[in-house]
Each structure stands twice: as C-alpha cells, then as structure tokens.
Swiss-Prot record:
Note on domains (UniProt): GABAARs subunits share a common topological structure: a peptide sequence made up of a long extracellular N-terminal, four transmembrane domains, intracellular or cytoplasmic domain located between the third and the fourth transmembrane domains.
Function of the protein: Rho subunit of the pentameric ligand-gated chloride channels responsible for mediating the effects of gamma-aminobutyric acid (GABA), the major inhibitory neurotransmitter in the brain. Rho-containing GABA-gated chloride channels are a subclass of GABA(A) receptors (GABAARs) entirely composed of rho subunits, where GABA molecules bind at the rho intersubunit interfaces. When activated by GABA, rho-GABAARs selectively allow the flow of chloride anions across the cell membrane down their electrochemical gradient.
Name the UniProt record assigns to this protein: Gamma-aminobutyric acid receptor subunit rho-3
Gene Ontology CC entries for this record: chloride channel complex; GABA-A receptor complex; GABA-ergic synapse; postsynaptic membrane
Entry's transmembrane regions: 264-284, 297-317, 329-349, 444-464
Oligomer status and interactors: Three rho subunits (rho-1/GBRR1, rho-2/GBRR2 and rho-3/GBRR3) coassemble either to form functional homopentamers or heteropentamers. Forms a ternary complex with SQSTM1 and PRKCZ.
Biological process, per Gene Ontology: chloride transmembrane transport
Extracellular topological domain: 16-263, 318-328
Organism: Rattus norvegicus
Catalyzed reaction equations: chloride(in) = chloride(out)
Flavoprotein found in the keyword field: no
C-alpha cells in the first residue's frame, strides 16, 4: 500500500515537471525566431489591413456621406463658375442632304466644390472613374441642336474625374456628337459653310451656373491632321453668349465655330467639265451639212439627253431647297445652249425648205420636177429624188438666180461624189461648201461660242 502511494506521487511529480519545462521552452523558441521572419509577418498583416481599410479612407476623405450633393456648390449664393475647354479629335462627316456634321472631341469641365476638399500633406489629387460621378454634383451640359451623341466606352467608359485637395474638380469626357448645321447652298459648290456646336446647361440658368471658356480663345484646340474629302477647314474659333427661354430665363451658352470651304476641283471634274463638253459638242452640228438631217438631229437629241442626265445626277445628291443654287444656274444655262443648238437646226431646215420651194416656183418647175413621192423623200432625208427627170438637168439656186447660173453643176445636192470629182477642183469644191451653208449656221459658229465664253467669265467672276 505504501509502495503504491509513493509510485503515484513520483509519477505526478514527473508529469508536472515536464509540463513546466515545455512551457518555459516555447517562449524561448519564440524569442529565438529570426528578425526577418518577424518583419515578413508584420508586413503581411499591414497589407491585409490596408486592403480592408483604404476604400473606406477615400470615402471618408471626400466626405461623400456627410453632404447633400443633389444641390450645386454654393447653393443660394452666387452662380458657380464652370470652365470649359475642348480638344477636337476629328470631324467625321459633313452631310449636305441631312444638313448636319459629326464631331469627336474631349470635353473638360472645371469647377470648385468645397464639399470635396480633403487634407493632404503632398497636395496630390485623386483620380476616379465613372462610379463616383453618380454620387457627387456635376454640371449638366448638353449640346443644342444635337441629333445623336454618345460617350465612348472602349475599353471602359471614357470618363475621368480628378479631385484636388482644395476642392477643385476636373471632369473629362470623350464624346461624339452629330448636330445640325444650317447650311446655305445658294453658292454651291462654290460655297463656304459656317457651322457651330453649342454647349449649354440644361437646368441651371445664369443665376445658378456661369459657363465660360477656361482659357479664353486658347480653350479650343484641334488636331493638325484633321481633313475632309470635300471640305477644307479654314478656321476654328470659340465664342460665348446668352440664350433666352420664355419659361426659364437666360442661360450661358458656348459656341465651337468652324468655317468649311468646299474643294471645287471634285465638282469641276464631275459636273462642270462634262457640261462644257456637251455644250461644245452641240456646236459640231453647225459644221454639218444642213441637208444631213439624221446626223444633226441625232447629235442634238444625244446632247440634250446627256445634259438632262447630268442635271438629274447633281440634283439627286443635294437637298431639295426652295432657292436656286450656283450649280443650277450653270447647268440650266448649259442645257439652254444645247437646246438652242437643236432649235437652230430646226430653223435652218425649215428656211432651207422654204427657200428651195421659192426657187423652184420662180423657175416654174414645181409641177414637173417634184411629185408627191419626191417631196416626201426630201422631207425624210433632206435630198431631192426624182426618177423621171434627168438629174443632170436639175439645178438649185440657193442665194440668187445670178449666182445659181454661175455655179450650176450637174446632179442634185445628194448626188454621188463621183459626179463632183468630175468637176474642176480649182475652187469649185470650196464654192459648193459655201453654197450649202446657211447664213444662220455661219453666224451660229461665232455667236454661240462667244456668248458661252462671256457667260463663263461672268459666272466664275461672280461666284469664285
């Protein structure tokens, strides 16, 4: 019994001593751990804390939850100044039919909101994306007379918000806008168009928001490589003004103005040059024998139809306006010249027929030389045909009876060329050509070109 007691006592004492030794050894091992491992452990703990706390610190720095941002800065006081500057990236298109233009640019707003001020020892600004825009006040700028507009969203929405410690804010957007341009086509295609993009606050009138160009005339910047296929950009300028609405009052308005001058070379090749060619081609009929009815009529009809096609093509590419354009003046005057060349031959043909009938009546041969079939044949091809009368006995007296007797030759005007070759070439061919030319054709060869040249001088002098 005594032996069992002592055995239990020594066992308890040994276990107690072992536990005390392990408790003393563990702190010693902790103390023996390397300083490097201690620093790594502390760094990890610090990073975990920063990841959890940093977003909360930014919200606290800007005091987002402590203010009501549904109202403008300085509500109830003077209007908040909002500066604007624009960097034009490109003018994508100009549409004459729709009377609009499409422009891509960077729009930057500058204002001060003391509710967003925060303490900073380095005086560095903080940059945010679009998510903060929904929580604070921003200017409600819109584009007057715009048809379509959107903010670019590749790869993310192109919105940037930068807040400075003193509360100054920069709000930047990349936007594409299609807006109206009230064009005047009275001088088209020798025209110059003045277009403008207008910016204005939608809700805040002059008592609440003052819109101005941040850097004056230098607030509007453009890329040097901007170019258009049909226009040359002469000038970019910035201006400002006030707009009045009867129901809400006066509003500040900013203008992005640009002047477009059309490239004329394209239209010279596509419109003016073909019209000139058709007019000059119509003059060829003045040099064709007046008895060659099919040749002159077909040439006149071809030039008239071609001019009609050119006029239709020009009108199809233009808006339907109620006034006369410069290109309309040129096209219709050119069409008039082509049409008059056809009328000129109709007059020549009629007068020639009347003159020949008078000559035949004076000689008393109308009954013997011209039967019904011969008259119909002459009306068809402009040549006299008679199978019963000897052709060598036929003579035409075109100017006077005395001249006709002097220049009488064998055969009709449409006789075979071999008959003419049998005549003496000592001036007879030239005399025959002169006798076949009507006086109207002779004058038309001079009058038509001279008048058309005078018209071109006046036209280009007025419109260019």
């Amino acid at each position: 019994m005594v032996l069992a007691f002592w055995l239990a006592f020594f066992t308890y004492t040994w276990i107690t001593l072992m536990l005390d030794a392990s408790a003393v050894k563990e702190p010693h091992q902790q103390c023996l751990s390397s300083p490097k491992q201690t620093r790594i452990r502390e760094t990890r703990m610090r990073k975990d804390d920063l990841t959890k706390v940093w977003p909360l610190k930014r919200e606290q720095l800007l005091h987002i939850e402590d203010h009501d941002f549904s109202t403008r800065p300085g509500f109830g006081g003077s209007p908040v100044p909002v500066g604007i500057d624009v960097q034009v990236e490109s003018i994508d298109s100009i549409s004459e039919v729709n009377m609009d233009f499409t422009m891509t640019f960077y729009l930057r707003h500058y204002w001060k909101d003391e509710r967003l001020s925060f303490p900073s020892t380095t005086n560095k600004s903080m940059t945010f994306d679009r998510r903060l825009i929904q929580k604070i006040w921003v200017p409600d700028i819109f584009f007057v007379h715009s048809k379509r507009s959107f903010i670019h969203d590749t790869t993310v929405e192109n919105i940037m918000l930068r807040v400075h410690p003193d509360g100054n804010v920069l709000f930047s957007l990349r936007i594409t806008v299609s807006a109206m341009c009230f064009m005047d086509f009275s001088r088209f295609p020798l025209d110059t168009q003045n277009c403008s993009l207008e910016l204005e606050s939608y809700a805040y009138n002059e008592e609440d928001l003052m819109l101005y160009w941040k850097h004056g005339n230098k607030s509007l910047n453009t890329e040097e490589h901007i170019s258009l296929s049909q226009f040359f950009i002469e000038e970019f300028s910035a201006s400002s003004g006030l707009a009045f609405y009867s129901s809400t009052g006066w509003y500040y308005r900013l203008f992005i103005n640009f002047v477009l001058r059309r490239h004329i070379f394209f239209f010279v090749l596509q419109t003016y040059f073909p019209a000139m060619l058709m007019v000059m081609l119509s003059w060829v009929s003045f040099w064709i024998d007046r008895r060659a009815v099919p040749a002159r009529v077909s040439l006149g009809i071809t030039t008239v139809l071609t001019m009609s096609t050119i006029v239709t093509g020009v009108s199809a590419s233009m808006p339907q306006v109620s006034y006369v354009k410069a290109v309309d003046v040129y096209m219709w005057v050119s069409s008039l010249f082509v049409f008059l060349s056809v009328i000129e031959y109709a007059a020549v043909n009629y007068l020639t027929t009347v003159e020949e009938w008078k000559q035949l009546n004076r000689r008393g041969k109308i009954s013997g030389m011209y039967n019904i079939d011969a008259v119909q044949a002459m009306a068809f091809d402009g040549c006299y045909h008679d199978g019963e009368t000897d052709v060598d006995q036929t003579s035409f007296f075109l100017h006077s009876e005395e001249d006709s007797m002097r220049t009488k030759f064998t055969g009709s005007p449409c006789a075979d060329s071999s008959q003419i070759k049998r005549k003496s070439l000592g001036g007879n061919v030239g005399r025959i050509i002169l006798e076949n030319n009507h006086v109207i054709d002779t004058y038309s060869r001079i009058v038509f070109p001279v008048v058309y040249i005078i018209f071109n001088l006046f036209y280009w002098g007025i419109y260019v």
